[in-house]
């Protein structure tokens, strides 16, 4: 049995836009962290500094993947909104004959 759809295409698009904004915010945060690491490396030298920077570099791909996933959700919600809108119109056209 199908569930009840309680969302409009406009609401889905608005939510998609929010996911897109959050995706960009993650990338902005990565840029800020890159600058902070660079600044820190100019003040802190040695093995511990290198270990800290290496640890960040190992984590950075996860941040990028998070941004990519948020962008994927953005696109999926947009596609769902388009499908919902199109399907509703198709049903209306069938009813009209």
From Swiss-Prot:
Keywords: Coiled coil, Secreted. SUPFAM superfamilies: EsxAB dimer-like. It holds the Pfam family WXG100. It is found in: Secreted. Disruption phenotype: Cells lacking this gene display an increased bacteriophage SPP1 resistance phenotype. Loss of delivery of LXG type toxins to target cells. Residues 21-94 form a coiled coil. InterPro entries: ESAT-6-like_sf (IPR036689), T7SS_ESAT-6-like (IPR010310). Its main location: secreted. Changing residue 44 to F/Y: Strong decrease in secretion. The WXG motif and the C-terminal tail are crucial for secretion. Required to deliver LXG toxins to target cells. Belongs to the WXG100 family. sagEsxA-like subfamily. This is Protein YukE. It comes from Bacillus subtilis (strain 168). The gene is yukE.
